[in-house]
Design a protein with these regions (language model features):
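Cap/insert and terminal regions of metallo-dependent hydrolase folds
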Residues: 176-257
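Binuclear metal-dependent hydrolase catalytic cores
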Residues: 1-171, 180, 237-256
Length: 257
């Protein structure tokens, strides 16, 4: 099936521009240097699957004219990946009397349920709450004829999910990739990887480390995401191999799912 991936956000947890920062990237006139928190939308066969609800989801949805979602997948529970959950309200209302399904690994699902009790506990059923249903995910999932396979990655000291779907994979927030996960990254047309900056970080990959991952996984094309203000878009792209680029907010890629 033909599918389209839209990069809703390509930035790090603080976004770019970063509050109070006077660096050149934060004051850049290049729109590619404006980076909201990391998320992608996958569309195929009239369906739409979102990966992560960032604090910028409302802005991202308005920018991309998102009017429909059929499922949401969560990579993990850090603030920059879940805090936009309440902004699912207007889209989730379109699912009534059904609820919009949200999928997360079991430990993440429990965390989300506890953090947003007003959404999930019956005693809080008042007002216009998001009409969503949280479902634990511990293996491959078929959504509307497409297979979404969790790809475990290491984020600091925590195991979280990336996802493979068809000929594409999206891995964000990783400091290491387990040996067993490389088997899930073979034969890719598109691979998204975390590349925060050049300087080492305890929970995120660097540009140099992600280039080594590209050399091993051998996708046709690779795109870096979760980018901080240390990496100017155009200048950094000039240093990368021809099949590797920084992603940017609003980027659209077609692939087979």
């Amino acid at each position: 099936m033909n599918a389209r991936l839209t990069v809703l956000g390509s930035g790090t947890s603080m976004g770019v521009p970063t509050i109070g920062c006077d660096c050149a990237v934060c004051h850049s006139s290049d729109p590619h240097d404006r980076r909201t928190r990391p998320s992608v939308l996958i569309q195929y066969e009239g369906r739409a699957v979102l990966i992560d609800t960032t604090p910028d989801f409302r802005e991202q949805a308005i920018r991309e004219n998102i009017r429909q979602l059929d499922a949401v997948l969560y990579t993990h529970t850090h603030a920059d990946h879940i805090l936009g959950i309440d902004d699912l309200r207007p889209i989730s209302f379109l699912h009534k009397p059904n609820k919009l399904p949200l999928y997360a690994r079991p430990d993440a699902a429990e965390f989300i349920r506890n953090m947003f009790r007003y959404i999930f506990e019956a005693k809080y059923k008042f007002g216009s709450l998001p009409q969503v249903e949280l479902r634990p995910l511990d293996g491959p999932l078929e959504l509307f004829g497409a297979r979404f396979e969790p790809v475990p990655v290491i984020h600091g000291e925590t195991e979280i999910y990336g996802f493979r779907f068809g000929s594409a994979a999206y891995l964000t927030d990783h400091s290491d990739i387990p040996e067993s996960s490389y088997a899930k990254l073979q034969g890719l047309d598109i691979l998204f990887l975390d590349a925060l900056r050049h300087k080492p970080h305890p929970t995120h990959s660097t540009v140099e480390n992600s280039l080594r991952i590209v050399e091993r996984a051998k996708p046709k094309r690779a795109f870096f995401t979760h980018i901080c203000h240390d990496l100017p878009h155009e200048e950094t792209n000039r240093t990368l191999p021809p099949n590797v680029r920084l992603s940017y907010d609003g980027m659209k890629l077609d692939f087979e799912i």
